[in-house]
Amino acid sequence: MSKSLWSPSQDAISRSSVYKLMQTLKINDYQSLHTWSINNLEQFWSIAWDQSHILGEKGERSYIPADFMPEAKFFPDATLNVCENLLSNKYKDEIAITSILENGDKLKISWDELRKNVFTCANAMLNEGVKPGDRVVAWAPNNSQTVIYTLAALSIGAVTSTASPDFAPAAVLDRFTQIKPVLLLSSPSYQYNGKTIDCLKSLNEIVNGLPTLKKVILMDISLDKYENWDSWIDPFQDMSFEYKKFSFDHPGFILFSSGTTGKPKCIVHRAAGVLLKLRAEQLFSFDIDESDKVFFFTTCGWMMWNWLIFILGSSASIVLYDGSPTYPNLHRLLEIAEDENCTRLGLSAKYIDLLRKSEANYTDKFQFNNLKTIMSTGSVLSPDGFRFVYQNIKSDIQLASISGGTDICGCFIAAVPILPIFSGEIQGACLGMAMDVLDNDGNSLPADIKGELVCLKAFPSMPLGFWGDERNSNFKQSY
């Protein structure tokens, strides 16, 4: 076996949530713990609920298997509000969200400000007649308003979906026409690569293609046809708001496939399933807690955006950045992580490779005193990419190559805080995820043979189905 690039300290191991779980269960190593977790799904996900401090009525049953794996049920008797679970912590004046634009403009929002804004926005949505199950969409930048809007939709049981402003009108309409939204949030412009890009012409085209819209809300400015964000929410600033609870299978998100073989598939996710899956990842794969500040470079068109905002459920602070990752310089994302004293940084493998090809050494330029983890995803991180991070960015860091997808709004395989890092390797499968690599005939393959990465058992963030696929026929054909 090759020499490890990094190993956790004994102190870090003993403080980790996954080690504490091993101690509780009297299990000595991660592989045995993982095997236990996939052989005892009901008990594992019940523990994950408890240790994540999920607010709500858990109910008696944790798991009901099914012949067709995606039809298995988790917590069928549970009721909860996902937004409440993301915002209900003890913090008030501490910063919850830092939102940064490409030109350097920065907005910091405290936990109390975030709650107030979400409740105000939720009341504005209720005033528009938005009901549980209605679709509420955004074609918008990655900023605090988009997060507030999304959380408000979740708080009232609406189904939310987002698209990045770099999506052309045709791409947006291919997605949103299928789900018939009632509200749309957008921005008159966005910044990218040193330019301000006007969105109004494209917005008009999108709105004209969505006849079900009751209201279009525009960030920053007012136009005759569209209401300004501030004027929309201001009448509801002082209104009270009370969370309503929904079933575990209540839909919360619609994410979209790439659309390479036709119109993008509208993948419907149960909000509570995503909450539990991501809280389990945050707890056992990454050890994220209230001491963390997490920056993951993403747009609103990628599932990692949903992944990032659910970090709020760990009482951690998040950093949003809207703009080019390489403007005004190649190391812009590293600058943000340094300036914001981030503890966790999420990058694409492609971006790390761009840094590597520049042959720059960043160890003198950046100290990264608080940075504990760099996460890499989007594609395979090469062994050269691993070595570059340790030699040219920071040597004492957990480099977590992770893999998941839009289909599950989470990770299949990710970090393991108690194990060493080896070049070109992902540390292990997430707890509760029964992963294997199969050939075309469904046979399990040895570790050194390429095949299809497959999850063999049910987990909470499996999709509910495809929107509009009433008999689940297309869904069953796809999975």
Put a short name on every predicted segment:
Residues N103, L183-F248, S358-E359:
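ANL superfamily adenylate-forming
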Residues V159, L275-K293, M303-R344, S358:
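Conserved AMP-binding/adenylation subdomain of ANL enzymes
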Residues Q31-W36, C83, I97-L151, A168-L173, ...:
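Conserved AMP-binding/adenylate-forming core of the ANL superfamily
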